[in-house]
Amino acid sequence: MQIYLAVTPAEAQEASRFRCSLAHVAYCIGPDSTLLRQNLLLQTRGGLLSVTDRGAPFIASPERLSAAALRECGRRSYGGVLLDFEQPPAPDRLAFAETLARRLSPRPVYVPESYAAASGAIPLICTAISGGNFVQRLQEAAAGRDRAGGLALDVQRLRMDFTLPAQSGEGRPLSGRELQDLL
């Protein structure tokens, strides 16, 4: 099982002591389908390239953006890409995910579950659920996939207090001390 720890450039050096692969949360989509990078250490190598679409413009050229991501993967020896898309699925983002997955293959391209329709990409299934059966949830997510190993888990460490009934599935965040007091 491969585990990636998502880190910003400021967290990368400290996180490297955990001896696991890192997903470098340092990239975003810029104007004219460019790939923009935050300040990374020169020696940053391996792990995943993580791209956000927060505040990103329309992707006019999925090919151009894919080529930029491919070059960066080669330069930094990244083993794949995590598309940390926050926007709802849109044709330009789906086209980028599919183009990148095709060009980067056999290296993985991970996408949010809402982008699971992107051919060749691996959907991330969020493990932070507030009810139901987790095994059933995974079985349902896997049912639509065409190959084994076609899912990845997005594990988030959360501490929340839920007032029942929890209609929204969102609870009130708890500090470590508040959780201990409840236990």
Question: Which functions belong to the PLM regions below?
Answer:
Residues 1-183:
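Secreted glycan hydrolases and related glycan-binding modules that recognize and/or cleave
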